[in-house]
């Protein structure tokens, strides 16, 4: 689960980035949450890879602990 600054209008673009990870099984956004939560289900731990991918494309993305 990640805190992001992704807005609903950018969801499609972000999904394209996330589709590059074959380890991701499911992606869900919660734009009503103040943290614009991104939830992903994966095979294995790719947390840092997701953060790096989104951060390098101009988005804030940090795992919620």
What are the residue ranges of the model-derived segments?
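Short Gly/Ser/Thr- and Asp/Glu-enriched loop/turn motifs at secondary-structure junctions
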Residues: 31-35
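Short glycine-/aliphatic-rich beta-strand segments at the starts of folded cytosolic domains
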Residues: 1-6
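Short amphipathic alpha-helices in soluble, non-transmembrane regions
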Residues: 13-20, 49-58
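Residue-level signal for inorganic ion chemistry
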Residues: 38
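Conserved short beta-strand edge segments in small beta-sheet-based binding/regulatory domains
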Residues: 27-29, 57-65
């Amino acid at each position: 689960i990640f805190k992001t600054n992704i807005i609903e209008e950018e969801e499609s673009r972000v999904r394209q980035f996330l589709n590059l990870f074959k380890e991701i099984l499911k992606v869900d956004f919660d734009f009503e949450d103040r943290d614009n939560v991104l939830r992903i289900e994966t095979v294995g731990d790719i947390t840092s890879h997701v953060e790096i991918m989104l951060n390098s494309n101009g988005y804030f993305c940090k795992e919620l602990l």
